[in-house]
């Protein structure tokens, strides 16, 4: 992971602003501890903190075209960069081996309307000194975070994390996923549009399991490009186990040269985190034994988790209960992963949104409702699991890649017949995915019930969080919460506790508005609560809130 920081529409002293930009960019150096770079002129400033994974020696940023007239700062990975280099290499003189430099080639060729050509995860800021124009863009689902804000002079700031904007901006907001801002028309435009957003476009499709299986294998393989050691996050659940199995299949050869040479680090390392004796640790070890990975089991105590909560809220920049519950073990694990010399990991985020994997999907009344909920969940994922995976890992300088959210894979998986994703009546959640990959995994894992990450690390983790919140937040505080927190008013003591910490760390009203809210059961959207009368009486995002869970709340 890297970080970017940019200032545009400059109206104040550029020399002083450059100093300020360096100071604010430094707040995100945990994302990119390997190198720092800056471009500064009277009209634009671009700062970058680099985590070097591809082209370690020559890929420092900002990147420039040959004429030094186009400047680019990027946080991301472009998985189809080799194909784009081949296509544009006769018309653009590449200066580095960085995968991200293809953005400059595309801009030179097409102007601002090229973002859908990119397959990957990214957030970037590009400055064109010839036109005195800038282009800001974010990937299709917002896998990579990006925020924007304005100061009292009307100067525009962009940054990978809001902590770099809060000290200087009057207002901030999340830069929309799947969108770009081109300064010459001044509008934020959405570029990510798919036919599968509409149920009618997919309802009569025929599901091809072979195509689905191959699409995921292709996605994982493309995500393996790396010039540094990498690993896999292996919780022992279906999604991370599938990603680990496919990664193991290709890890012995370098994908960068079409598998002509041996991988520089042929032994695949896997990582699991949990309280001692937790459900995830046992299942993860079983998968690791089956696949033959070098497995690392990372333990944490409830007290260690509690001690990390404030740091987690600072790094994840949220007060969302589910996100904080799940981010804390991930944050602790990331520190150990970095200590072992690993700089990139593959993870299983996104599968539950694509395939209707959360336990509340058992209550989906029909295929149309299920499909529409999966689309809602995917388009909102930048506020939840994408933020968690990205920021919890980058807090310690580790990059998380998410093959289930690959754009090409989504175009296959979201076009299969939604009826084939329905669960209940004897069918397990994500049964179509299980059927595709059951040969890759032990049967006990291929058909293991969905366990949310915050539950799977150990049930006592969430139970203790609730107990601590009950001790620290009074009944009166919760009853009067609407006066202190009129926006996204906390509805539980746990939520109140997190919100209190968040407001201390980010004391800007618009910062709180960057965090999602609303009722949820087992990670559902507010809309899906209408599926079951019992949901309307609950307000707990744990999977144990749904009766089909084997350890459901009584």
Curated annotation (Swiss-Prot):
Notes on how activity is controlled: Glutamine-dependent asparagine synthesis activity can be inhibited by aspartic acid analogs (such as a sulfinate derivative and (2S,3R)-2-amino-3-methylsuccinate) in vitro; the inhibition is competitive with respect to aspartate.
Similarity field: Belongs to the asparagine synthetase family.
Outcome of mutating residue 34 to N/E: Little effect on the kinetic properties
GO biological process: amino acid biosynthetic process; amino acid catabolic process; asparagine biosynthetic process; glutamine metabolic process; L-asparagine biosynthetic process
Residue numbers annotated as active site: 2 (for gatase activity)
Catalytic activity: L-aspartate + L-glutamine + ATP + H2O = L-asparagine + L-glutamate + AMP + diphosphate + H(+)
Pathway field: Amino-acid biosynthesis; L-asparagine biosynthesis; L-asparagine from L-aspartate (L-Gln route): step 1/1
Phenotype when changing residue 2 to A/S: Loss of glutamine-dependent activity but no effect on ammonia-dependent asparagine synthetase activity
Site keyed Important for beta-aspartyl-AMP intermediate formation: positions: 349
Enzyme Commission no: 6.3.5.4
Binding site residues for L-glutamine: 50-54, 75-77, 99
Protein name, UniProt field: Asparagine synthetase B [glutamine-hydrolyzing]
Gene Ontology MF: a single term: asparagine synthase (glutamine-hydrolyzing) activity
């Amino acid at each position: 992971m890297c970080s970017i920081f940019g200032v545009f529409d400059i109206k104040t002293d550029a020399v002083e602003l450059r100093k300020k930009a360096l100071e604010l960019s430094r707040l995100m150096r945990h994302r990119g501890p390997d190198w720092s770079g800056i471009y500064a002129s009277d009209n634009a400033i671009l700062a970058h903190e680099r985590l070097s994974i591809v082209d370690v020696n020559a890929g420092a940023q900002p990147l420039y075209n040959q004429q030094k007239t186009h400047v680019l700062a990027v946080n991301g990975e472009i998985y189809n960069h080799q194909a784009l280099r081949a296509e544009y290499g006769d018309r653009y003189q590449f200066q580095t081996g960085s995968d991200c430099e293809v953005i400059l080639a595309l801009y030179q060729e097409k102007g601002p309307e090229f973002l859908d050509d990119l397959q990957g995860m990214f957030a970037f800021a590009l400055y064109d000194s010839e036109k005195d124009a800038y282009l800001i863009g974010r990937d299709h689902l917002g896998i990579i975070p990006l925020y924007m804000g304005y100061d009292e002079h009307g100067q525009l700031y962009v940054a990978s994390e809001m902590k770099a904007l809060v000290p200087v901006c009057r207002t901030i907001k999340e830069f929309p996923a799947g969108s770009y801002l081109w300064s010459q028309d001044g509008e934020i435009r959405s570029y990510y549009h798919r036919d599968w957003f509409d149920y009618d476009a997919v309802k009569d499709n025929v599901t091809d399991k072979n195509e689905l299986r191959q699409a995921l294998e292709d996605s994982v393989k493309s995500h393996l490009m790396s010039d540094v050691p990498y690993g896999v996050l292996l919780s022992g659940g279906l999604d991370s186990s599938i990603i680990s199995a496919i990664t193991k299949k290709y890890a012995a050869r370098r994908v960068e040269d079409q598998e002509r040479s041996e991988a520089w680090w042929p032994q695949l390392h896997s990582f699991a985190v949990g309280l001692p004796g937790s459900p995830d640790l046992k299942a993860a070890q079983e998968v690791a034994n089956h696949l033959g990975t070098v497995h690392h089991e990372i333990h944490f105590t409830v007290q260690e988790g509690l001690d990390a909560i404030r740091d987690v809220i600072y790094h994840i920049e949220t007060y969302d209960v589910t996100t904080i519950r799940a981010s804390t073990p991930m944050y602790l694990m990331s520190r150990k992963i970095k200590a072992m010399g690993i700089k990139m990991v593959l993870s299983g985020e996104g599968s539950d949104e694509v395939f209707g994997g959360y336990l509340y999907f058992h209550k989906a009344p029909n295929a149309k409702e299920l499909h529409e909920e999966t689309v809602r969940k995917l388009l909102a994922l930048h506020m939840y699991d994408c933020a968690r995976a990205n920021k919890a890992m980058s807090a310690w300088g580790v990059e998380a890649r998410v093959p289930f959210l690959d754009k090409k894979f989504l175009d296959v998986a979201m076009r299969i017949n939604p009826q084939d994703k329905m669960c209940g009546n004897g069918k397990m959640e994500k049964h179509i995915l299980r059927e595709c990959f059951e040969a890759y995994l032990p049967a006990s894992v291929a058909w293991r019930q969905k366990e949310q990450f915050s539950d799977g690390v150990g049930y006592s983790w969430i139970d203790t969080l609730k107990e601590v919140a009950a001790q620290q937040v009074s009944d009166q505080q919760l009853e009067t919460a609407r006066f202190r927190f009129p926006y996204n008013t906390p509805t539980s003591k746990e939520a109140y506790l997190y919100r209190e910490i968040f407001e201390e760390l980010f004391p800007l009203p618009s910062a709180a508005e960057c965090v999602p809210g609303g009722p949820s059961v087992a990670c559902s959207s507010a809309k899906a609560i209408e599926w079951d009368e019992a949901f309307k009486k609950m307000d707990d995002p744990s999977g144990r809130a749904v009766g089909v869970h084997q350890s459901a709340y009584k």
